[in-house]
């Protein structure tokens, strides 16, 4: 065991067109819809996953929802990056509480 093993954690990410899974220690810790809600004017991410899905079609015109994957392929790299970062943060919060 190296000195930096304390600071690292192995995770697996399954990017799907409908859902994205994040797995650590052989457990699914994140299972969220593959969708991002962004502010059209600022480009800021407002929500990811279930929260973004709840906003789909029901929000102000300045908020857009994006499905970053189409037919199993990344269609919007920026949105996919935001989604992955957000889901990793959720994973890290989950594992730090465990």
Stretches found by the model and what they are:
Residues 94-98:
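Conserved small/polar residues in nucleotide/adenosyl-binding loops
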């Amino acid at each position: 065991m190296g000195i930096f093993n304390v600071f690292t954690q192995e995770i697996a990410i399954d990017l799907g067109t409908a859902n994205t899974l994040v797995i650590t220690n052989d457990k699914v810790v994140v299972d969220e819809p593959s969708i991002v809600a962004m502010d059209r004017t600022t480009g800021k991410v407002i929500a990811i996953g279930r929260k973004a899905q709840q906003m789909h079609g029901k929000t102000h015109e300045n908020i857009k929802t994006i499905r970053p994957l189409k037919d199993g392929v990344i269609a919007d790299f920026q949105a996919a990056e935001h989604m992955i970062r957000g889901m990793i943060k959720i994973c890290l919060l989950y594992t730090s509480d465990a």
